[in-house]
Amino acid sequence: MEWVWALVLLAALGGGSAERDCRVSSFRVKENFDKARFSGLWYAIAKKDPEGLFLQDNIIAEFSVDEKGHMSATAKGRVRLLSNWEVCADMVGTFTDTEDPAKFKMKYWGVASFLQRGNDDHWIIDTDYDTFALQYSCRLQNLDGTCADSYSFVFSRDPNGLTPETRRLVRQRQEELCLERQYRWIEHNGYCQSRPSRNSL
């Protein structure tokens, strides 16, 4: 009789996993996203890495909205080059609105030419504006609509991180993105604030 219950349990687990939709078009984003409330300083405390060379840690981003309602951002963080050369690098991004207020096209580039540049989707998956935000970008989709190359940041207003309750919420949203256990924590030790200008790009 035990094997019957085991089969029932396996069927239930299989059915639950089959219900999850990992197509990018199915992902929920923040409803009624407010750019003005989102503006200001954010500390990246975890990220899912894409292909290519991006900022690695000590990442601080500042979002701003101009008088015409256009959003832009600057970011600074540490990058390791040639395995042993560490520098602080700056990146810049401008955002184009779409029909969904939480979905943008982000044109970004590094002040230094070796950094990644592109024009990616930039989605705000969730935020409460005051403590946390979860961002997601898919740069390349598979034929079945799932993502082949994505990156995602968990942002906090506090460099010390998030509360346990907020972390649980973020993990739930990461699972909805089919990215559970793919993030790594980002260190903030003041590296780029303490570096001389010759170590910045």
UniProtKB/Swiss-Prot annotation:
InterPro entries: Calycin, Lipocalin_ApoD, Lipocalin_CS, Lipocln_cytosolic_FA-bd_dom, Retinol-bd/Purpurin. It comes from the Eukaryota. Detected in blood plasma (at protein level). It holds the Pfam family Lipocalin. The keyword Amino-acid biosynthesis does not apply. Keywords: Disulfide bond, Methylation, Retinol-binding, Secreted, Signal, Transport, Vitamin A. Disulfide bonds join 22-178, 88-192, 138-147. GO terms for cellular component: extracellular region; extracellular space; protein-containing complex. Residues 1-18 form the signal peptide. Its main location: secreted. The modification Omega-N-methylarginine is found at residue 139. Substrate binds at residue 116. GO terms for molecular function: protein-containing complex binding; retinal binding; retinol binding; retinol transmembrane transporter activity. It is found in: Secreted. Belongs to the calycin superfamily. Lipocalin family. Retinol-binding protein that mediates retinol transport in blood plasma. Delivers retinol from the liver stores to the peripheral tissues. Transfers the bound all-trans retinol to STRA6, that then facilitates retinol transport across the cell membrane. Interacts with TTR. Interaction with TTR prevents its loss by filtration through the kidney glomeruli. Interacts with STRA6. This is Retinol-binding protein 4.
